[in-house]
Amino acid sequence: MLMPKRTKYRKQQKGRNRGKAYRGSTLAFGTYGLKAVELGRINSRQIEAGRVALSRTMKRTGKIWIRVFPDKPLTAKPVGVRMGKGKGSVEEWVMNIKPGRIIFEITGVNNETAVRALTLAAAKLPFKTKIVSMESENELY
């Protein structure tokens, strides 16, 4: 499970996820990538499911980079507990995703394998994505 080793404060306010991504919106390491098209929130289980789908499809050839890290705590109260009595405990760690953010990058595989792997990884994410390549920074398929 991806989560910070330590934080200054245990809990955060919810905040609002608006706008588009300017940082982390271009390919930096690999030749193919998965780019978010809409707003969303990704947790560590979804990142791990995408990573497993990529590595199984690529059959341990090539290299995978995970460009996101869940650093925002999400709190929840237990079921059957009345409102009040303070904020709930931390349930999971998430990251707010804005349109244009690169989620995964891969290299060292051919075009067909890259598209197949990234399509499977995209199915594990809760928001729409598109596949981009180094040659064309816009949509590949």
Swiss-Prot record:
UniProt cross-references to Gene3D superfamilies, sorted A to Z: Ribosomal protein L10e/L16 (3.90.1170.10)
PROSITE patterns associated with the record: RIBOSOMAL_L16_1, RIBOSOMAL_L16_2
Pfam families to which the protein is assigned, alphabetical: Ribosomal_L16
Signal peptide: none
Matches recorded under SUPFAM superfamilies: Ribosomal protein L16p/L10e
Region span, Disordered: 1-20
Quaternary organization: Part of the 50S ribosomal subunit.
NCBIfam families: rplP_bact (TIGR01164)
Family recorded in the similarity comment: Belongs to the universal ribosomal protein uL16 family.
Annotated function: Binds 23S rRNA and is also seen to make contacts with the A and possibly P site tRNAs.
PANTHER family (UniProt xref): 50S/60S RIBOSOMAL PROTEIN L16, LARGE RIBOSOMAL SUBUNIT PROTEIN UL16M
Protein's recorded name: Large ribosomal subunit protein uL16
